[in-house]
Amino acid sequence: KRNPLFLLKSFEWRSLHSTQIPYYIIPQIYFGYSYSPDRFSYGSLVNQWAKYSGKTALYVGLGAYKIGAGAECEKADWESGRLLEKQIKDLRSLKYDGFVVFSYSSLFSNDPLNTSEREKISQLIGAE
């Protein structure tokens, strides 16, 4: 019996993309800019995904649940109170179609870092 995670990891979305057109693709990029190894850092992954263009909308899943609790190598990113704001600005400059936040409820914690991130995102969205 195959592990469903293996099947998910081995899914080749580009073959689907060439035969059927999905409405959107949402890579879950839940890493900070200083994540190590660098090939999995936020900046590296969004630049890689930005190369895939076509008729399919491209959004990015952002890991709000990691606010204040990222991996040791990226801890400063997740404790800045501005990481999601920076990530969203970068997505806009790369012409992504949007973003999705997981878990949205994480933004509404009473923790000062979560509050800061929520306020920064609200300002960005309000500036559109």
Question: What kind of region is each of these model predictions?
Answer:
Residues W13-D38, G54-E128:
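Substrate-binding cleft of secreted/luminal carbohydrate-active enzymes
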Residues V46-G54:
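Surface-exposed amphipathic alpha-helices with a cationic face
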Residues L5-L8, S15-L16:
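Mature, folded catalytic cores of secreted/periplasmic enzymes
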Residues K1-N3:
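Beta-propeller domains
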Residues L7-S10, F40-V46, R82-L84:
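Charged helix-capping and loop-helix junction motifs
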